[in-house]
């Protein structure tokens, strides 16, 4: 549904987004994750047509947003980080006003407004002035205006920003519900939000895309973690006799223990995603070489660990999980 190619945005000499490319299919729930200033909001604004890219292309539902901006925008519901609300208006009047901005015909507005209010659990607040609402309810009003016209793509920028734990949980439930009918892109700097509601994550760093992976695949590494009592001078020659080991990374833990991360090439066999298939060879090689084996296990990583690793690496091409 979304095809982004080499997207860039510069402000004078500052490059806010640098040649970002990705594709998102219909029905996916994708988290756009990065520190503040990583380029998330800039990408959101370019996806919605509110900001022109300096270079690159965006196609949504097969249409170029540069040449078909209005048609593309009719497919999108957008919740900006600070959604502009009119505090003197009631919720229902504000949604009627927004329906007009979305081009919803007058005859269709009552039904669509009722639907948006019901989906965001605003029935009890529909006649209340927005000024009287809590932050959590105001965020729901922002979501309600984004889904009024039944968009095919829903873009949410920091939807849980400033909410308390109970309100965050309610917003997560709402996002999962909305994802039944629309593709959802969720921008956040909070790891837990991506883990709670997303199927896939795009991680940005300094305007560059450094990871594109499905969350379910993050724990499926082709690496073994080996801990023995010997230094690389002894261990690495033993490990290099095993053809499936393509790289060895040494991580000393104590004077008596050394950890080695082993990158594996297991081919295309059915067991290719299970690094344990090579573990017996590794164990045999190091023990026959006189090493004391402490642990040998598949390396696992969660999103927090991966995010920290990416922060420590030099910027380069995006990694795909």
PLM regions and their residue ranges:
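Positions that flank functional sites
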Residues: 114, 132, 253-255, 301
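ABC transporter nucleotide-binding domains
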Residues: 2-4, 9-205, 209-211
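Short secondary-structure boundary/hinge segments and terminal tails
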Residues: 76, 117, 135, 219, ...
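C-terminal coupling/interaction segments
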Residues: 267-321
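ABC transporter nucleotide-binding domain
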Residues: 170-266
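Hydrophobic/anchoring residues in structured secondary elements
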Residues: 9, 247-250, 298
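Surface-exposed charge patches
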Residues: 97, 115, 237, 284, ...
